């Protein structure tokens, strides 16, 4: 049995398979998941697991080069935006329109769906390298 890091076998496999600049998405329970993109559905009820809890576990186990969020999060969910910025202090941040954000999800290796039910609690993580 695995002792550290991500215990979810699907998430661990996706993280292990990422190459430089590949992307994964951590999403609230309302973000549309495009056809053809791997869905890892963790949602068990509204709010569980939370977006921030899942983000923290994934971020602890992933080399992240860039973080992308919808610019709407700045006004519509300032608390989540602030927490993401505080937890992920090293990668570059990019804000795009929610429409553009959804277009970028079509190229993700996987979308991890949480139980989060607050607006724009979604992030695209671009894989970095460990050297």
From Swiss-Prot:
It is an enzyme of class 5 (isomerase). The active site is at 20 (proton donor). GO terms for cellular component: cytosol. The keyword Cytoplasm applies. Its EC number is 5.4.99.62. Pathway: Carbohydrate metabolism; D-ribose degradation; D-ribose 5-phosphate from beta-D-ribopyranose: step 1/2. Substrate binds at residues 28, 98, 120-122. It holds the Pfam family RbsD_FucU. It is found in: Cytoplasm. GO terms for biological process: D-ribose catabolic process. SUPFAM superfamilies: RbsD-like. GO terms for molecular function: D-ribose pyranase activity; intramolecular lyase activity; monosaccharide binding. The keyword Isomerase applies. Catalyzes the interconversion of beta-pyran and beta-furan forms of D-ribose. Homodecamer. Belongs to the RbsD / FucU family. RbsD subfamily. NCBIfam families: PRK11797.1 (NF008761). This is D-ribose pyranase. It comes from Bacillus mycoides (strain KBAB4). The gene is rbsD.
